[in-house]
């Protein structure tokens, strides 16, 4: 980039730079769709195939593990990755990117992505809090991000909120209810449909209790032999943990750590909420984040693109990321701003101009 061009970009407002980024994203999307016309022609079918293929893959891995064909670690890793595809599908469905003229098919796909990720709120409720997130990202009434620790100072409480849904409900729930009560009251979707999440949590905490008990016996040098009546329960919990509980927890923990830290929460200098697309997110594509990205489909490196253009399927966002990332950097979106994580995700500005430095 020439010095003159860099100077012109620096002189742009956030709105102007955001508009440039949107143009580049849409340009890259058009190039892909023109080169591969099937992407547009079969977009609905692609979404359905990914949904059913991912769910079917999780079932297949479970069967292979139960049949003692694949080890536990392989089942956990592959199922966790497949569950991350289902999360991306839910996200696309929230923005009606597939079967927008068929509520029946959309609802069927919503059911699939929910049943195979039972530790989440139902997708109809999440749709409303996610669309709210796009309107108020970086504000105190951003229910979706604050619930997973965005804006919290680093410490034990934040770690617990990122990793444990019950801790999130206990620690963040009262604050969010206070700060976003009008928005929560406007939500029409039912919060509870079937007790899927509660059932998941019952199984999950039972497994954790069993594991801690076994660990305690091991540390004490005592052989852990469950009574005969408990043995089938232990076997069931261990199997459920490998095929469903741990993969779902891994996926959820990974995306909550990444998402809560790639979104900014307020402007540290002006103590104001963020209303600029350029300042809402950063790009996390450091190798340090790779283990987490394995279970959240490279979320930190590409989700910022979605904030600029919401009507792009996740696989096209990934496909076009190498092209679009250059525009994000050029127009001032920050990269790997780990310093913000030590400042409760506050957006730090440089000097009086308040323009982002490009890392």
Give residue ranges: language-model regions.
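Non-catalytic, topology-defining segments of multipass membrane proteins
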Residues: 1-82, 89, 115-249, 311-359
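Long helical/loop segments within the catalytic core of UDP-sugar-dependent glycosyltransferases
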Residues: 81, 291-300
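Conserved, well-structured beta-alpha core segment at the onset of a catalytic domain
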Residues: 84-88, 104-107
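Histidine-centered catalytic micro-motifs
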Residues: 86-96, 126-138, 258-267, 299-313
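Transmembrane helix-loop junctions in multipass membrane proteins, especially transporters and channels
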Residues: 92-96, 100, 213, 217-224, ...
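Juxtamembrane helix-capping/reentrant segments at transmembrane boundaries
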Residues: 98-118, 145-154, 272-289
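Transmembrane alpha-helix/helix-exit interface in multi-pass inner-membrane proteins
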Residues: 170-172, 252-269
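Active/binding-pocket-proximal capping segment
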Residues: 264-277, 321-326
